Swiss-Prot record:
The lineage of its organism: Archaea, Methanobacteriati, Thermoplasmatota, Thermoplasmata, Thermoplasmatales. It comes from the Archaea. The keyword Cell wall biogenesis/degradation does not apply. GO terms for molecular function: mRNA binding; translation initiation factor activity. Keywords: Protein biosynthesis, Translation regulation. This is Protein translation factor SUI1 homolog.
C-alpha cells in the first residue's frame, strides 16, 4: 500500500519528494520599534512548502506572546524570544541561525 502512487505524477517529479527542513536556514533577529518595544523577527521559512501561519501560531503559544505574519514570509513576535523560538524551531526540524 505504501508504494501506490495516487497522484499519477512520476515519483521524481513530485514536489514533496526529497524535501528536508534541514536544507532551510531560518534566521532569527531582534528589532527595536517605537517607544523602545522589542520584536523578534523570524525569516527564511518558505511559505510555498510550509504553513507559515501554523508555525507562527505554535510559536505564539509557546512564548505566550502576540505576533503576526508580515508579507506572508516573516514572523514577528512581540518581545525578545530568540532563545525560545530557536529551541522550538529546532525541535520542528529547522536549521536556525541567530543574527
Amino acid at each position: 500500500m505504501k508504494d501506490k502512487n495516487f497522484t499519477g505524477i512520476p515519483k521524481e517529479l513530485q514536489p514533496w519528494e526529497g524535501f528536508d527542513r534541514n536544507n532551510e536556514v531560518v534566521k532569527i533577529s531582534v528589532d527595536k520599534r517605537r517607544y523602545g518595544k522589542v520584536v523578534t523577527l523570524i525569516e527564511g521559512i518558505d511559505p510555498k512548502v510550509e504553513d507559515i501561519n501554523e508555525i507562527a501560531k505554535s510559536l505564539k503559544k509557546k512564548v505566550a506572546s502576540g505576533g503576526t505574519v508580515k508579507d506572508g514570509k516573516i514572523i514577528e513576535l512581540q518581545g525578545d524570544h530568540r532563545e525560545t523560538a530557536r529551541a522550538q524551531l529546532e525541535s520542528m526540524g529547522f536549521k536556525v541561525q541567530m543574527v
